[in-house]
């Protein structure tokens, strides 16, 4: 959004086209190579951990590396550990397909957001993409990438491959001049530091940088630049926001995994389970409760594209047009 308004007019040559020619990764198609991280090698030479990879025709590591690893995706809840839950839902090649144009020459964040950085960051949040059945896990990844893609989009209406193929084009707010510092005894601003939007969720304000840094073991009040210079830290801040409830708001994770039960006050305010409540959590004060809004529609567009690629349904209540915003509190993006 901060990045979005600047990026709408982004025009690029059609150089980085959708034709991704990616060589097979394993098995007979790749000289007998094994998949990394104990993933299964499918009959077609691709690495993954779902039944499509580990089932009929699997060439190697079909039961993981000596039992316990690998597996066939799905199953009940529980933590993934080691970032494996994300890997089980989204392979590296699928990640490249979802965030198709993030490394385009016109994107300021090109080369920054990597699959390995996401997997490493997710290891610090073992419940992410590890709660519920296979469809629920995929839906959480689609929702997370959908919301963060809107925050970092470089797309426009007639962009190559459509506007929803241009997530993760930005890593920090463009043209920020304000410090985004709110006086706080608990999270005091450091001299000469600015807390404008950075990273996938466009983390903003000292009262977000402080607790996010504390949670992930980084001093982000004194070093807010880390969110735009270290891709693992960057993803960790977004996942921290996603996984952490901030009363009266539930966590995005609890909403998308069906673990949030709205109160009578929530129901009266139109806040019912679904993707729309996540938009309300992130930026409801500016986007929700005012009727149709292009920003809300953009968030939905990304989410729907990712659900389509992952082969899952969207669920209900996708927008927040008629929802009253939560009380002012955590505001990750403007």
UniProtKB/Swiss-Prot annotation:
Expressed at high levels in roots, sheaths and meristems. GO terms for molecular function: chitin binding; chitinase activity; endochitinase activity. It comes from the Eukaryota. InterPro entries: Chitin-bd_1 (IPR001002), Chitin-binding_1_CS (IPR018371), Endochitinase-like_sf (IPR036861), Glyco_hydro_19 (IPR016283), Glyco_hydro_19_cat (IPR000726), Lysozyme-like_dom_sf (IPR023346). GO terms for biological process: cell wall macromolecule catabolic process; chitin catabolic process; defense response to fungus; polysaccharide catabolic process. It is an enzyme of class 3 (hydrolase). Its EC number is 3.2.1.14. Disulfide bonds join 26-41, 35-47, 38-65, 40-54, 58-62, 107-169, 181-189, 288-320. The active site is at 151 (proton donor). Keywords: Carbohydrate metabolism, Chitin degradation, Chitin-binding, Disulfide bond, Glycosidase, Hydrolase, Plant defense, Polysaccharide degradation, Signal. It catalyses: Random endo-hydrolysis of N-acetyl-beta-D-glucosaminide (1->4)-beta-linkages in chitin and chitodextrins. Pfam families: Chitin_bind_1 (PF00187), Glyco_hydro_19 (PF00182). Belongs to the glycosyl hydrolase 19 family. Chitinase class I subfamily. This is Chitinase 9. It comes from Oryza sativa subsp. japonica (Rice). The gene is Cht9.
């Amino acid at each position: 959004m901060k990045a979005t308004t600047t990026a709408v007019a982004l025009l690029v040559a059609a150089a980085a086209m959708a034709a991704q020619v990616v060589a097979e990764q394993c098995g007979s198609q790749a000289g007998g190579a094994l998949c990394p991280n104990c993933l299964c090698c499918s009959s077609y030479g691709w690495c993954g951990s779902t039944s499509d990879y580990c089932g009929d025709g699997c060439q190697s590591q079909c039961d993981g590396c000596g039992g316990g690893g690998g597996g066939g995706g799905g199953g009940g809840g529980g933590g993934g550990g080691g970032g494996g839950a994300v890997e089980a839902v989204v392979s590296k090649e699928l990640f490249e397909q979802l965030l198709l144009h993030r490394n385009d020459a016109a994107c300021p964040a090109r080369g920054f957001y990597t699959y390995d950085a996401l997997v490493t960051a997710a290891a610090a949040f073992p419940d992410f993409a590890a709660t519920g059945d296979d469809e629920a896990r995929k839906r959480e990844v689609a929702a997370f990438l959908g919301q963060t893609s809107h925050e970092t989009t470089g797309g426009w209406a007639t962009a190559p491959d459509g506007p929803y193929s241009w997530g993760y084009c930005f890593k920090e707010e463009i043209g920020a001049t304000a410090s985004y510092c709110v006086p706080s005894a608990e999270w005091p601003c450091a001299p000469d530091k600015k807390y404008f939007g950075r990273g996938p969720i466009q983390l903003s304000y000292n009262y977000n940088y402080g607790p996010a840094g504390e949670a992930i073991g980084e001093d982000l009040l004194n070093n807010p630049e880390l969110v735009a210079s270290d891709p693992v830290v960057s993803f960790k801040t977004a996942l921290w926001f996603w996984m952490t409830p901030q009363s009266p708001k539930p966590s995005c994770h609890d909403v998308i995994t069906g673990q949030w039960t709205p109160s009578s006050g929530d129901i009266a305010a139109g806040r019912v389970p679904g993707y729309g409540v996540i938009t309300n959590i992130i930026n409801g004060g500016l986007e929700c409760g005012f009727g149709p809004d292009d920003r809300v529609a953009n968030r939905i567009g990304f989410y729907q594209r990712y659900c389509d690629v992952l082969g899952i349904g969207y669920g209900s209540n996708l927008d927040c047009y008629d929802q009253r915003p939560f009380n002012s509190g955590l505001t990750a993006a403007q």
